[in-house]
Structure formats: C-alpha cells, structure tokens
UniProtKB/Swiss-Prot annotation:
Organism per entry: Koribacter versatilis (strain Ellin345)
Enzyme class per UniProt: transferase
GO molecular function: magnesium ion binding; thiamine-phosphate diphosphorylase activity
Keywords: Magnesium, Metal-binding, Thiamine biosynthesis, Transferase
Residues that coordinate or bind 4-amino-2-methyl-5-(diphosphooxymethyl)pyrimidine: 44-48, 75, 114, 143
GO biological process, one term: thiamine diphosphate biosynthetic process
InterPro entries: Aldolase_TIM, ThiamineP_synth_sf, ThiamineP_synth_TenI, TMP_synthase
Protein name: Thiamine-phosphate synthase
HAMAP family, per database record: TMP_synthase
Binding-site residues, 2-[(2R,5Z)-2-carboxy-4-methylthiazol-5(2H)-ylidene]ethyl phosphate: 140-142, 171
GO cellular component, one term: cytoplasm
Protein family: Belongs to the thiamine-phosphate synthase family.
Reactions that this protein is recorded to catalyse: 2-[(2R,5Z)-2-carboxy-4-methylthiazol-5(2H)-ylidene]ethyl phosphate + 4-amino-2-methyl-5-(diphosphooxymethyl)pyrimidine + 2 H(+) = thiamine phosphate + CO2 + diphosphate; 2-(2-carboxy-4-methylthiazol-5-yl)ethyl phosphate + 4-amino-2-methyl-5-(diphosphooxymethyl)pyrimidine + 2 H(+) = thiamine phosphate + CO2 + diphosphate; 4-methyl-5-(2-phosphooxyethyl)-thiazole + 4-amino-2-methyl-5-(diphosphooxymethyl)pyrimidine + H(+) = thiamine phosphate + diphosphate
Amino acid sequence: MASGLKLPRLYAIVDADCFGPEPSLATLTHFAKELVAGGVTLLQYRNKQGSAREILSHARELKRALPPEVTLLLNDRADLAIAAGFHGVHVGQDDLSPEGARLVVGPEMFVGTSTHNPEQLQIADKATVDYLAIGPIFATKSKINPDPVVGLDRLRAVRKLTSKPLVAIGGITRENCRSVIDAGADSVAVIADLLVDPRQRASEFLQILHS
C-alpha cells in the first residue's frame, strides 16, 4: 500500500455524467477549481461514458489546472491514472480488482475500492488498498441501478470490521453528512450536493463536517 494518505472529511467527486452527454473540459476544470477554492483537498474524477482518450485528456488538464497539493484519484482506470500523473485510482465491484489495480499502479500510488455490504467490505479489507468505500448510505440518483441502501445502522456495524479509512457514499448532503461521520465514517463522498455553487457548498460541507 502507499503511505501518507490522510483522507479529508470531504471526498469530492467530479462526475462527468452530471454535466451532460459531452461535457466540455472548460466546464469540468472550472467546477474542480471552484471546489478547491471552497476548501476541497481531494478529488476523484469519474467518467463512465467517455473514451480512454477523452478521460486521459480531461485528467491531464485537471492535474495541470489544480494546485499540486490536491490529491487526485481516477475512477476505474488504473492505466490512465498513471498516464495522467494522478495520485491514485478508485475501483468498483465491476472494475479491475483492487489487487489488479495495485499490480498496475505499484506500491506508491493510492488504491481505493467500493463495497456495498459487509461481506464485500470484509473481502476488500484483506486487499492492499489504502481505503474502503461503503454505500449507498442513503438513496441516491447519481448512479444508475444503485445497490440497496446501507443505512446508518449498517455503517456503524461495518465500521467495526475494518481499521482502514472508511469513505461513505450515496445520497449524502449537508443536512445528513454529520450523522454519517458520527456513525463511523472517516470521510463522506459527495457528488450531487456539490453541483450548484460548488465553492460555497464545499465550504458549507467542511464547516459542518469539522463542527
């Protein structure tokens, strides 16, 4: 595993699918810059529909445009994470396995993985990953055919199953994010509730999460 990953309370996701069928690079970059201006220090770039060429082009521009201290993770594509100069990769249950991703990126880059129930989390906990994600905690519209809702009670239960950093994702808003941290998550991943006025929203999230 890589060393030195300290998960911030807010794990912001820049999801290209939220910006229309052909999101412009300028739009994505401006959005990411606004998040960072609001205090975000870690970003995941997610693009489920784009070609490898498009994803790499976008990722490289994000890397160029953002301050070097911002940790950048790429969803799904370990190979493109390396090519873009990102700090790590995040893989899901239907992507390259965590161990496969580790073989691709080596020991120096970060690897995280998504889980949706206690069984998946326990399996992933044995892999050489730097953090685990669990969700959806609440109902979400950011994913087509989402997995069953985990809920706060099950989040509390899975917290006891791992000592690794735990990211909660799915339906998390400014109204409920504090309850997610109180239930045991180290960080909350957010997509939808950052889309409008991202600088202000990020600042509000961080104020709540650190209260």
